[in-house]
Amino acid sequence: MPGDYAPPQGRLLLARSQGELAGCVALHPLEPGICEMKRLYVRPQYRSQGVGKALLKAALAEARAIGYRRMRLDTVEPVMQDAVRMYRAHGFREIVPYRANPMEGALYMELELIE
């Protein structure tokens, strides 16, 4: 897979349930030691079943395995309240914007991956 999400520094992870695609998440490098999580998506019929949490945990594990020290993301808080709660529950904290996002209510978050 070419592009930002290609190995060795990027990843595209898929979640399946009974052979059906349930969701996805991707990682790509931002700068040395820092990755960005993108495209965390769970299909509507698989929501509230732990798929999003499983994808987030898999993305965190992959980022650590690659050697990233921090993970960043941006989201839209008014629309993605459940996702924002999940990110906060996993230790993400709000940071200043690190790139432009034209959406109103954009929220930027970061997690230290080194424990």
Task: Say what each PLM segment does.
Residues 19, 50-52, 67:
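Conserved G/P- and acidic residue-centered "switch" motifs that form tight phosphate/ATP-binding loops
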Residues 63-75:
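Conserved GNAT acetyl-CoA-binding A-motif
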Residues 47:
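Glycine-rich ATP-binding loop(s) of histidine-kinase-like ATPases
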Residues 44, 73-83, 100-104:
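Conserved beta-strand-loop-alpha-helix junction that forms the acyl-donor binding cleft
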Residues 87-96:
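Conserved acetyl-CoA-binding loop of GNAT-fold acetyltransferases
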Residues 1-38, 43-44, 56-58, 62, ...:
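Acetyl-CoA-dependent GNAT
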Residues 50, 54, 58, 81-82:
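Alpha-helical macromolecular-interaction surfaces
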